[in-house]
Amino acid sequence: ATRSYGNGVYCNNSKCWNVGEAKENIAGIVISGKASGL
């Protein structure tokens, strides 16, 4: 599960990220994840 700490930081079981700083990185991870899954 993903947890929000209310200040733009989210954590899941493996890592934490700052949404404001990482939106583009998350999009890139999702895209590359889909590409590697093909």
From Swiss-Prot:
Superkingdom assignment: Bacteria
Keywords for the protein's UniProt record, in alphabetical order: Antibiotic, Antimicrobial, Bacteriocin, Disulfide bond, Secreted
Main location: secreted
Temperature-related activity annotation: Thermostable, retains activity after heating at 60, 80 and 100 degrees Celsius for 1 hour. Long-term storage at 4 degrees Celsius or -20 degrees Celsius does not affect activity.
Activity vs pH: Stable at pH 5.0.
Record's subcellular location: Secreted
A single GO BP: killing of cells of another organism
Gene3D superfamilies in the record: 1.20.5.130
InterPro entries: Bacteriocin_IIa (IPR002633), Bacteriocin_IIa_CS (IPR023384), Bacteriocin_IIa_dom_sf (IPR023388)
SS bond list: 11-16
GO CC term, one of those recorded: extracellular region
Task of the protein: Bacteriocin that inhibits the growth of closely related Enterococcus species and a wide range of Gram-positive bacterial species. Inhibits the growth of several strains of the Gram-negative bacterium E.coli, but not the growth of Gram-negative Pseudomonas species.
Family: Belongs to the bacteriocin class IIA/YGNGV family.
Protein name: Bacteriocin enterocin-M
Species per Swiss-Prot/TrEMBL record: Enterococcus faecium
Species lineage: Bacteria, Bacillati, Bacillota, Bacilli, Lactobacillales
